[in-house]
Regions:
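Short Gly/Ser/Thr- and Asp/Glu-enriched loop/turn motifs at secondary-structure junctions
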Residues: 12, 73-75, 110-116
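Short, solvent-exposed loop/turn elements at domain surfaces
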Residues: 24-28
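Basic, Lys/Arg-rich DNA-contacting stretches centered on the C-terminal catalytic core
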Residues: 29-39, 111-114
Length: 204
């Protein structure tokens, strides 16, 4: 199940479990990080609540968790999260998501829902905005669920410092003019996008 997860990530003690939980008054479930050693909530600012990969996998089974996740700590690993960009029924991938995947070229997998994309990278993120529309980029004080369900071309876990700067500027960066700012603020397109078969074989 987790064979495709890069070994370099597995060797780091940044792992947690996670579980779907619904807080009172909310209409959706959150993916809450869980300390896989004791079943209590994990904290992004407390590494003592993280563990090694094998312990996270065992904790998932022991505590009946929904999955495992990776905590970012600002030590040269970051993640890109693109929500609601893939239709598993039609296998259509949003063109903007396809562009980000093709440009960054690092380990890419489907989110637990099967409709989002997570990209895990080495390197440094540019300073500035972390989220705009459906695109998020984080290197610290956040965690990503990790499925091992690799998507598209099997890009290796790579240093993306230079490549991600281009995508950060395009999708998250502050624009110098109002027209540019309005364009950048638009959410990911919701219409029909790129067919995933094409993205795997041709676009990516």
């Amino acid at each position: 199940m987790y064979e495709k997860i890069p070994l370099e990530l597995k060797q780091l003690p940044h792992w947690v479990g996670w579980k779907y939980m619904q807080h009172p008054g909310e209409d959706h479930k959150r993916k809450v990080p869980i300390n896989a050693m004791d079943g209590q909530p994990a904290k992004s600012n407390d590494p003592t609540t993280w563990c090694d990969f094998d312990t996270a996998c065992r904790g998932k089974e022991r505590f009946g968790l929904d999955g495992i996740g990776f905590m970012f700590s600002g030590d040269g690993i970051f993640g890109i999260d693109i929500d609601h960009c893939y239709d598993p029924e039609t296998q259509e991938l949003d063109p903007a998501a396809a562009e980000i995947i093709e440009t960054v070229q690092s380990y890419t997998e489907l989110s637990p829902s099967g409709t989002g994309i997570h990209i895990l990278c080495k390197g440094a993120l540019p300073e500035g905005r972390k989220r705009r529309g459906a695109v998020e980029m984080y290197s610290t004080l956040r965690y990503f669920t990790v499925t091992g369900n690799q998507f598209g071309l099997e890009y290796p876990f790579s240093d993306c410092t230079e490549r991600v700067a281009v995508m950060h500027r395009k999708y998250l960066g502050e624009e110098e003019n109002a027209a540019g700012a309005q364009k950048a603020a638009l959410p990911m397109p919701t219409g029909r996008g790129t067919n995933a078969d094409m993205s795997v074989d041709a676009i990516l």
